[in-house]
Design a protein with these regions (language model features):
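N-terminal non-catalytic structural scaffold regions of very large proteins
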Residues: 1-169
Length: 169
């Protein structure tokens, strides 16, 4: 019960599922961020039948949450944010059936290359370079061990990666 309340109070307000369709293309996914790909059946509240949705989990949320003493009075117990989101994915899609899902994380090329001759303002160049690192070229894709071939192939295509860049963890 505590986990459900925590999800509804602290996590759910920050999650924005994006149903993919021509008007809503695959979103930008930051380097090494926690994300979920979800396969759905049925229509959403607007009558759309988008089969795939992406749920990006904000970095502002702690990855490990300590359960309060009233729930675990004798020892410190922690629950992972990813397991909380996994357990409540269906709450993000009312009236729809979640048929499969997978957690995923993309690693992006993060070299910072600055041309000393072209850089007039080092501070600005560094700021722009560091921002670009979050959304550089994808080089590796991690998915849950049980991720279906359909979902992993879909993600590989979105990130323009070969099969050799896929890691099941």
């Amino acid at each position: 019960r505590w986990v459900h309340d925590y999800f509804m109070r602290e996590v759910r307000p920050l999650l924005i599922p994006v149903g993919l369709d021509p008007a809503h293309p695959f979103p930008q996914v930051a380097n090494k961020s926690l994300n979920f790909i979800v396969r759905l059946k049925g229509r959403d509240a607007f009558g759309r039948e988008n089969e795939i949705a992406i749920v990006k989990v904000p970095r502002a949320l702690p990855r490990l949450i300590r359960m309060p003493p009233k729930v675990a009075p004798k020892e410190a117990l922690f629950v992972s944010l990813s397991s909380i989101v996994r357990a409540h994915l269906h709450d993000l899609f009312p009236g729809r059936e979640v048929t499969e899902f997978s957690q995923f994380r993309v690693t992006r090329h993060s070299d910072l290359a600055l041309d000393e001759e072209d850089v007039r303002n080092l501070r600005t160049a560094l700021r722009q370079g560091l921002q670009h690192r979050h959304y550089g070229q994808a080089v590796r894709l991690e998915v849950s061990a049980g991720c279906s071939v359909f979902l992993s192939d879909f993600l590989l295509e979105q990130f323009d990666l070969p099969g050799a860049a896929l890691y099941r963890v």
